[in-house]
Regions:
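Domain-level signal for soluble alpha/beta catalytic cores
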Residues: 1-216
Length: 216
C-alpha cells in the first residue's frame, strides 16, 4: 500500500494537530465536544481538516477520538467523521486515519471489544489506516490489532501512548514497557508517544529509547 511505500525510505509522515483544541478555540465553541460537530456542524470540521492540510499535513485523523457511550449516536458520528475527512483529504492526496481514543474505563464492553466494534464501522466506510492514540495502557490493543488484520490484511495500525515527562502514563505504567509490548505485536505497524508531555520532553523520551528493541 502507498502508506508503507511512503514510509519505506524513512520519510517522515506529518500528521495534523489536535482537533478538540482547534475546535474549542473557535468562537462560541469552548464548552462543546468536537465529535458531535460531525453531525451538527460538519462544515466547521471540514474547515479544520483543510487548515491542517494547507499547512502541510500529509495525514489527518477522523474527528472521532471520543464518540461517547451511546452506540447508535457513536456509529453516526463515526460515519459522518469518515465522510468529512475523506472529502477534505482527497484534493491533497493525503492519508486518512481512523482515530480511536482510549476505551472508557467503566464502559459496557471490554476495551478490545469496544475497539473492534468501532473498527468495523470504520472499515465499512472504506478506511484501512488506524491510530489508537493517547493510551494510558495497552488493554485491548492486541485484540484490535488481530481483528483488523483478520478482517483487512492490508490494514495499517499505529499505537500511541500518553506519558508524563517522566515517561509514565496516568495508570502508572512505563511508556517504554508499553512501546516494547506493542512493537512486539506483528499486527501493529508503528508505535509512539503523544499528548500530556510537550515536544521537548517527548523528544527526550524518544531519544532515550533503545530502537533496536522496538524493531527499529
Amino acid at each position: 500500500m502507498r502508506i508503507r511505500e511512503d514510509l519505506a525510505g524513512g520519510r517522515p509522515l506529518l500528521f495534523d494537530g489536535a482537533m478538540g483544541t482547534y475546535y474549542a478555540a473557535r468562537p462560541g465553541r469552548g464548552a462543546e465536544r468536537c465529535e458531535q460537530a460531525n453531525l451538527d456542524a460538519p462544515e466547521e470540521i471540514a474547515a479544520i481538516h483543510r487548515a491542517y492540510l494547507e499547512a502541510g499535513a500529509r495525514a489527518i485523523r477522523t474527528n472521532t477520538f471520543d464518540v461517547g457511550g451511546d452506540w447508535e449516536r457513536a456509529r453516526r458520528i463515526i460515519e459522518a467523521g469518515c465522510a468529512i475527512a475523506l472529502a477534505a483529504a482527497e484534493p491533497f492526496g493525503a492519508h486518512v486515519f481512523a482515530d480511536l481514543g482510549p476505551a472508557p474505563q467503566e464502559g459496557p464492553l471490554p476495551p478490545g471489544e469496544h475497539y473492534c466494534r468501532q473498527a468495523e464501522v470504520f472499515l465499512a466506510q472504506g478506511l484501512t489506516h488506524f491510530i489508537l492514540e493517547t493510551l494510558p495502557g495497552d488493554e485491548g490493543l492486541q485484540e484490535l490489532a488481530r481483528y483488523l488484520k483478520a478482517r483487512c490484511p492490508e490494514a495499517f495500525l499505529l499505537a500511541s501512548f500518553a506519558v508524563d515527562p517522566g515517561g509514565v502514563t496516568r495508570e502508572g505504567v512505563s511508556g517504554r514497557a508499553l512501546l516494547a509490548r506493542a512493537a512486539a505485536l506483528d499486527e501493529v505497524d508503528g508505535v509512539g508517544f503523544n499528548c500530556v508531555s510537550g515536544p521537548r520532553h517527548l523528544l527526550e523520551l524518544v531519544q532515550g529509547l533503545d530502537l533496536s528493541a522496538l524493531g527499529g
